[in-house]
Amino acid sequence: MANYTLAPEDEYDVLIEGELESDEAEQCDKYDAQALSAQLVPSLCSAVFVIGVLDNLLVVLILVKYKGLKRVENIYLLNLAVSNLCFLLTLPFWAHAGGDPMCKILIGLYFVGLYSETFFNCLLTVQRYLVFLHKGNFFSARRRVPCGIITSVLAWVTAILATLPEFVVYKPQMEDQKYKCAFSRTPFLPADETFWKHFLTLKMNISVLVLPLFIFTFLYVQMRKTLRFREQRYSLFKLVFAIMVVFLLMWAPYNIAFFLSTFKEHFSLSDCKSSYNLDKSVHITKLIATTHCCINPLLYAFLDGTFSKYLCRCFHLRSNTPLQPRGQSAQGTSREEPDHSTEV
């Protein structure tokens, strides 16, 4: 039966680097990603998968059962956790066998999870800005939840559409006596292979780095200009901004290395040493970025007082009394941030 391995170094990032090399007279020693992968990737992916799935399932439980989904930010946070779960589900299969359908499924889950996470981070940031700008009166109470649901559906649809190019061009290919899910241009696609590799790289950089960085920077600068921002500090503002900052810090190194690897001829980085270092940088930064799914639940626990309270009660760390679901808890235990700071 045909087997393939989907590993972080097997995606089009490193493949681009290798296939776009110009024919050089000197023989270059290519970076051997398998050496590091054999030692680190299985244990790292297993740890990230277990921790990330448990953390994000706990977030889903608390949001759905206890905090409720009557606030727009909770709807976005729930979808953000689902995005992380989609991404995490691909990790165990980076070193396991499968067939052509499995390749498509893994590619779809991986990129849909990544793109949707980016979009929900942007939606959270914009929502916090609108709350701050309009003091919670931008929408009526009856329109808040429907607006959150509609924008969430649009975010998922956009993420799926953004993933279609990867879904089409990835196929199992024989490499090192086993099949790997890698870039392979389909004959019916227009333009040449180099064009599509450049296109996929730019799409990745714009969606995962440029777009969220622009939105975050622009809105944060606008908020910093007001006196009210310095006078009023709410934990949810800190939480949303921390989520975005961590996401950018985790994925920016990989996107930069990925971009330089793809367009290295344009930056005079085609020599042996530069190519080797770029391959290594892409591989290592990709592994680091993979761990981002475990960070968000930790931010909730440290920066969201309501979430940490529910979390502690779930584990009976502060109280042995049963935690009541939303709508049944007493006023003293269900108090969250003031309405003018948390609702749109």
From Swiss-Prot:
Residues 324-344 are annotated as: Disordered. One of its GO terms (cellular component) is cytoplasm. Expressed abundantly in immunal tissues such as spleen, fetal liver, lymph node and bone marrow. Strong expression also in lung and heart. Expressed in almost all hematopoietic cells including monocytes, macrophages, PMNs, T-cells (both CD4+ and CD8+), monocyte-derived iDCs, NK cells, and CD34+ progenitor cells. B-cells expressed isoform 1 but not isoform 2. Up-regulated on synovial neutrophils of rheumatoid arthritis patients. It is found in: Cell membrane. Pfam families: 7tm_1. Induction: Up-regulated by CCL5 on the pre-B-cell lines NALM-6 and G2. Keywords: Cell membrane, Disulfide bond, G-protein coupled receptor, Glycoprotein, Membrane, Receptor, Transducer, Transmembrane, Transmembrane helix. Residues 1-43, 96-104, 166-198, 260-286 are extracellular. Glycans are attached at residue 3. It comes from the Eukaryota. Residues 65-74, 126-144, 220-238, 308-344 are cytoplasmic. GO terms for biological process: calcium-mediated signaling; cell chemotaxis; chemotaxis; G protein-coupled receptor signaling pathway; immune response; inflammatory response; positive regulation of cytosolic calcium ion concentration. Disulfide bonds join 103-181. The chain crosses the membrane at residues 44-64, 75-95, 105-125, 145-165, 199-219, 239-259, 287-307. Coiled coil: none annotated. Lacks the conserved DRYLAIV motif in the second intracellular loop that is required for signaling of functional chemokine receptors. It was initially reported that CCRL2 responds functionally to CCL2, CCL5, CCL7, and CCL8 via intracellular calcium mobilization and transwell chemotaxis although no evidence for a direct ligand-receptor interaction was provided in this report. These results are now controversial, and other studies failed to confirm CCRL2 recognition and transwell chemotaxis of these chemokines or a series of other CC- and CXC-chemokines using CCRL2-transfected cells. Belongs to the G-protein coupled receptor 1 family. Receptor for CCL19 and chemerin/RARRES2. Does not appear to be a signaling receptor, but may have a role in modulating chemokine-triggered immune responses by capturing and internalizing CCL19 or by presenting RARRES2 ligand to CMKLR1, a functional signaling receptors. Plays a critical role for the development of Th2 responses. This is C-C chemokine receptor-like 2.
